[in-house]
Amino acid sequence: MTNIRKTHPLAKIINNSFIDLPTPSNISAWWNFGSLLGVCLILQILTGLFLAMHYTSDTTTAFSSVTHICRDVHYGWVIRYVHANGASMFFICLFMHVGRGLYYGSYLFSETWNVGIILLFTVMATAFMGYVLPWGQMSFWGATVITNLLSAIPYIGTDLVEWIWGGFSVDKATLTRFFAFHFILPFIILALAAVHLLFLHETGSNNPSGIPSDSDKIPFHPYYTIKDILGALLLTLALATLVLFSPDLLGDPDNYIPANPLSTPPHIKPEWYFLFAYAILWSIPNKLGGVLALIFSILILALIPLLHTSKQRGMMFRPLSQCLFWLLVADLLTLTWIGGQPVEHPFIIIGQLASILYFTILLVLMPIAGIIENNLLKW
């Protein structure tokens, strides 16, 4: 009798995606982050659901409701901090996942890559709106500053901002709609993640060598399910350590002050995972130019497949490209540091140089390195 997992319509989908899936035999721990992102997403949806049961999206009670969750709800503080720090873990996994894609040439699966870029934008939008919900000082002013950027759009900008706000400033209407969007978007992310996997399974996974591995595939289960479980355990350990020992390490102390439209915090800045983009934003003196640079800093990923000049897929055997890749990583860390600093000398000039270097590496140096490496190998 044929096994039910191979015949039942629903079980068959799960079987072909997670059990009998032919997988390259040589993929490394860098391929763990896809499943870790799935774990993070489920964790965020579950903790978010329980938080939403106690949260009120009204400007007068939002801050108090978060305090109530932490003080009065049974283990509410755990749920709240797992959700807040879970977002940080989500972004760490995201950056690792995208970095892996860049390093090993996974971006040549263009449909998978493009859905991934849409996912990245959606996750960033969700995280931004989630940061507004506790209605602390940084929530309010972060929302004001970031939504105000849309006013740089010629002609329709001001109307667009007021339309998003639901009034003439960030207020009750803004908070209510942000809560609604923050609730619905993770389910859209879940659907997009399924599409992401659908496209990936059309081609099969890439591998570190960048060479087609059709001749050497192994079943996903048990070989990679066990590795994914180990990865999930390590992620859980890291998250639990963060939540139980220093839950506010990655947050901003200003967000423990209730939102006050009459008092501006000394340094308005987003969460740490947006600081690199924030640094690029304020490294350009012109408002519209800054907004375009901000959007393009992520959208540039869509150009990467078009700028691939090497005849090899990944960077495993390309030392010149490897140097540029790690320079890019160092540059992004520099931008992250700059984004958290006050807008004054010498941070402005460092941010401008780091921003120029970021775009130069991706748009100019990496394609040139690919051509040089081809010539060195007489290809």
Swiss-Prot record:
It comes from the Eukaryota. Pfam families: Cytochrom_B_C, Cytochrome_B. GO terms for molecular function: metal ion binding; ubiquinol-cytochrome-c reductase activity. Its cofactor is heme b. A ubiquinone binds at residue 201. The cytochrome bc1 complex contains 11 subunits: 3 respiratory subunits (MT-CYB, CYC1 and UQCRFS1), 2 core proteins (UQCRC1 and UQCRC2) and 6 low-molecular weight proteins (UQCRH/QCR6, UQCRB/QCR7, UQCRQ/QCR8, UQCR10/QCR9, UQCR11/QCR10 and a cleavage product of UQCRFS1). This cytochrome bc1 complex then forms a dimer. Heme 1 (or BL or b562) is low-potential and absorbs at about 562 nm, and heme 2 (or BH or b566) is high-potential and absorbs at about 566 nm. This is Cytochrome b. It comes from Ursus maritimus. The gene is MT-CYB.
